[in-house]
């Protein structure tokens, strides 16, 4: 009976628990024994392995977060630590590892692969910044959370004829901001892909209020500028009350939406199948409505395609 380990790494994403449930169910089907690794790659180094049973996953498909935990472990970049992790896996008799996480996690997976450990990566990050998949686990739940929050801000902004500047997660990828902006009808969408022109933002907000609009919504990807400073500058330049809101980590939490549960289950089932057939060293993804697989090196060297269709659309729909 093959022994498979599974870990969650990086920032948590809604749907990770659905992936863990699928790993256990699929392991039963393929006659494999599944072990959970607590706290990501740190847990491998510390030998923190725990058998995952039916009961462990019987009520987690609808839960946010990850029952295995996830911690930042920068020490794993050191070759000596990677070697120790591989030795722990070999000593425990692990035949393959399932890594649920984002791009940084997949670099860790590649390190294990280079030490002879069969590894499969399953993309899970609300940032949706993994180039080898159209959508990562957690993205659509975070998107719904962002849109629901923006809808509420629109209500109060409209009541007071106010501008709201909303910071959305995503790091260097603007997908979450782009889709949240489209779905919420935001007047201005600012992402790493669009760039940031402060004067243009102020001018467009000013034009919106001159047309007697009751509100203006500006959504912007984190780390591009201080939303508090931008809100102050908009208010000073336009004389319209402006408020800044940072959605923050609320975007990572909550019960995963149906689509995240589905792709988590599909990708994890495929991942366990691959390891059961001694076929590792892959990163999985979703293309269209299919699960696809890439060699680790190929996946890590891919570039994230620009959402050209969507960006062209919002350019045409500017007020």
Where are these regions (language model features)?
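C-terminal non-catalytic interaction/assembly regions of soluble proteins
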Residues: 226, 233-319
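Accessory alpha-helical/coil subdomains and C-terminal extensions
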Residues: 99-101, 111, 139-241, 245
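Short Gly/Thr/Asp-enriched flexible loops that form oxyanion-binding sites at enzyme active sites
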Residues: 18-23, 103-117, 177
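N-terminal phosphate-binding or glycine-rich loops at protein starts, especially the Walker A/P-loop
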Residues: 1-45
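Short, acidic/small-residue loops that bind anionic groups at enzyme active sites
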Residues: 34-35, 113-136, 190-194, 246
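Short beta-strand elements at the ligand-binding edges of bilobed clamshell
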Residues: 132-143, 255-261
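Glycine-rich oxoanion-binding loops at beta->alpha junctions
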Residues: 44-97, 105, 137-144, 148, ...
């Amino acid at each position: 009976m093959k022994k498979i380990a599974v870990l969650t790494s990086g920032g948590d994403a809604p749907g990770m628990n659905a992936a863990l449930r699928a790993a256990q169910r699929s392991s039963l089907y393929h006659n494999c024994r599944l072990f959970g690794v607590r706290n990501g790659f740190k847990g491998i180094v510390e030998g923190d392995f725990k058998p995952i049973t039916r009961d462990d996953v019987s009520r987690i498909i609808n839960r946010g977060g990850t029952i295995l935990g996830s911690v930042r472990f920068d020490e794993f970049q050191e070759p000596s630590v990677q070697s120790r992790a591989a030795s722990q896996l070999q000593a425990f008799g692990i035949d393959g590892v399932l890594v649920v996480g984002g791009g940084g996690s997949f670099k860790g997976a590649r390190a294990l692969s280079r030490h002879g450990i069969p590894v499969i990566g399953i993309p899970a990050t609300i940032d949706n910044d993994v180039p080898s998949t159209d959508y990562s686990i957690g993205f659509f739940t975070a998107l719904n959370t962002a849109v629901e929050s923006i809808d509420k801000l629109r209500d109060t902004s409209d009541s007071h004829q106010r501008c709201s500047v909303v910071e959305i997660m995503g790091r260097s990828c603007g997908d979450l901001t782009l889709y949240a902006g489209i779905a919420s009808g935001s007047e201005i969408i600012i992402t790493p892909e669009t760039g940031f022109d402060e004067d243009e933002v102020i001018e467009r907000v000013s034009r919106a209020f001159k047309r007697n609009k009751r509100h203006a919504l500006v959504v912007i990807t984190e780390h591009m500028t201080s939303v508090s400073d931008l809100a102050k500058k908009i208010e000073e330049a336009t004389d319209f009350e402006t408020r800044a809101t940072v959605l923050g980590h609320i975007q990572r939490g909550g019960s995963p939406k149906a689509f995240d549960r589905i792709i988590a289950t599909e990708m994890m089932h495929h991942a366990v199948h691959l390891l059961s057939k001694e076929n590792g060293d892959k990163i999985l993804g979703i293309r269209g409505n299919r699960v696809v697989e890439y060699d680790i090196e190929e996946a890590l060297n891919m570039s994230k395609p620009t959402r050209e269709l969507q960006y062209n659309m919002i350019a045409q729909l500017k007020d």
